């Protein structure tokens, strides 16, 4: 009887590993075909503005802010694996940090402390010009990542153009990113 019970428990464990949930974006699981995911995203109020190869681009509202959303899928378009949110560019460091801190706080309240976080500012001054210069040089680092059920969520401040930056949020479904890498 103990052996039978052990086998049942082991089978349940194996099945639960295979039944891992997919990460979701705005309530839409990040899986399935590009066509189906894009249709669901459109139903959430996003407007498709273009696509190329295995990436579709949308404009819309993300938590009350205008954003551009990129959806990534396998080369054949059969499986979506990631969603990236791009907020408007800014030449103001304070705007970038406020947006970053706002979303970092939201994700920390929802998922707990980030699994990884690096916020490095080599400039000892709070000068917009110096901080934007450092961002352009790649010496300022603001990024945080959470390991969540089904994948990872990352937020960062990225260089955008000559003297601008933008806040970027990346949703990556663990199973589908791994499957895409194996191809």
Question: PLM ranges: what are they?
Answer:
Residues 24, 29-34, 53-76:
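Accessory recognition modules or surfaces
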Residues 20-53, 88-183:
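Non-cytosolic coordination micro-motifs
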Residues 60-105:
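Mid-chain, structured segments of secreted extracytoplasmic proteins
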Residues 10, 62, 74-76, 135-137, ...:
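Sterically constrained small-residue positions within well-ordered secondary structures
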Residues 4-15:
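Sec-dependent N-terminal signal peptides
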